[in-house]
Regions:
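C-terminal motif of bacterial Sec signal peptides marking the signal peptidase cleavage site
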Residues: 25-26
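Bacterial N-terminal signal peptides that target proteins for export
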Residues: 3-16
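Post-signal peptide N-terminal segment of mature Sec-exported envelope proteins
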Residues: 32-62
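Acidic/His-rich structured neighborhood in mature extracellular/periplasmic domains
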Residues: 73-234
Length: 248
């Protein structure tokens, strides 16, 4: 039986102090892990069932239509693409800000090899995420003082890899219907298969599921496939960038 969001919230509340105690026992990054826990908790508390938001008189017509479309794409993802059939993307959260998190990326000066950071669930990734833009900029400034090249980028969506029921976020609501569907496919693919410490494989797998899922989703609605020439050009550009990185 699928756990309710209320149960997951209680579990999260109980586990956070224990998890933080373990994580911080030999680590000085108390504030960083604290803001991660607080930010995720606030996001979970903001969730509402899609049906409730769709039926609410306070919901704008544009948002209502977008969520109705998302409902259909979400059902297709599990029924036809065999992606996880759970509560993710069947709830909505209004965050009141343009991005859900801001990621800080860093490389040694004149290098294309990213500095990685390791976490218990996600494994090692090439960024650190912050729920407040000011905190991200502050962390970036400290990294620059260490001689690193740094970039701060806003993120409109992310996946908890099935640990919680991920919502459709207000940060995603401005997207076109097609992009919203592809992101649902992409993020659910991460829940289906995720290999720790292998960002390249994880993104390649999720991107493949996204592209194939989009093709099938469009075909099911009687729409033509997305321009294959454009897709090939994007793939060629990606290979060129990766080859350039190897040479450098």
């Amino acid at each position: 039986m699928r756990c309710s969001r209320r149960v997951l919230d209680r579990v999260f509340t109980g586990l956070v102090p224990v998890a933080l105690g373990v994580l911080l026992s030999g680590c000085s990054s108390v504030s960083y892990y604290g803001q991660l826990a607080e930010g995720q908790w606030q996001l979970l508390r903001a969730r509402q069932p899609l049906d409730r938001v769709i039926e609410s008189p306070a919901t704008s017509p544009v948002l209502r239509q977008r969520l109705l479309f998302a409902e259909k794409a979400r059902a297709f993802a599990s029924a036809q693409l065999k992606l996880p059939d759970n509560g993710s993307y069947r709830v909505y959260a209004d965050l009141g800000r343009p991005y859900v998190v801001w990621n800080v990326f860093a490389t040694p000066e004149l290098s294309l090899q990213p500095v990685t950071h390791c976490f218990p669930i996600a494994g090692c990734v090439a960024y650190r995420g912050y729920y407040r833009q000011g905190a991200a900029r502050g962390a970036a400034a400290l990294m620059r003082q260490e001689g690193l090249d740094v970039y701060v980028g806003g993120v409109e969506a992310y996946s908890t890899l099935g640990w919680f029921d991920d919502p459709i976020l207000s940060t995603m609501a401005g997207w076109g219907d097609e992009r919203l569907a592809t992101v649902i496919f992409h993020e659910l693919a991460h829940q289906r298969v995720y290999v720790q410490d292998d960002t390249e494989f994880n993104e390649s797998f999720a991107s493949f599921v996204e592209q194939e899922g989009t093709r099938q989703w469009r075909a099911a609605r009687g729409l033509a496939a997305i321009d294959e020439v454009g897709a090939r050009q994007r793939e060629q550009f990606t290979r060129l960038v990766l080859a350039s990185r190897e040479r450098l």
